[in-house]
Amino acid sequence: MMSLSFMLGLIFPVFFMFTLANPMSLLLLLLIMSLCAVLWLGSIMSSWFAYILFIVYIGGILVLFIYVCMISSNYITGLYKYKTLLYVGMVVALMS
């Protein structure tokens, strides 16, 4: 049951990713997905391996963050409301 929760934690941000227009929000979702993957991996394998993997993810996300800050300076943060409701409804249906 715990494995199913972690897998849904990895799937939910993928559905939510299509509703975001801001690259910074996408980086935040990437961080959430990597954190869920590391927690899941830490529960089934060595916690040291999961910790090192998380540090590598954070390093990659920092490089992406710097790149996005240089390229796109003035994006407006916003959500597409109808797609968000559709994807949240799909995730709730999957979880029930």
Swiss-Prot record:
Topology versus the membrane: Multi-pass membrane protein
Molecular function as annotated in GO: NADH dehydrogenase (ubiquinone) activity
Keywords recorded for this protein, A-Z: Electron transport, Membrane, Mitochondrion, NAD, Respiratory chain, Translocase, Transmembrane, Transmembrane helix, Transport, Ubiquinone
Keyword set includes Electron transport: yes
UniProt EC number: 7.1.1.2
Catalytic activity: a ubiquinone + NADH + 5 H(+)(in) = a ubiquinol + NAD(+) + 4 H(+)(out)
Bilayer-crossing regions: 24-44, 48-68
Cell compartment(s), UniProt: Mitochondrion membrane
Enzyme kind, highest EC tier: translocase
GO cellular component: mitochondrial membrane
Family according to the record: Belongs to the complex I subunit 6 family.
Function field: Core subunit of the mitochondrial membrane respiratory chain NADH dehydrogenase (Complex I) that is believed to belong to the minimal assembly required for catalysis. Complex I functions in the transfer of electrons from NADH to the respiratory chain. The immediate electron acceptor for the enzyme is believed to be ubiquinone.
Protein name as annotated: NADH-ubiquinone oxidoreductase chain 6
Source species: Albinaria turrita
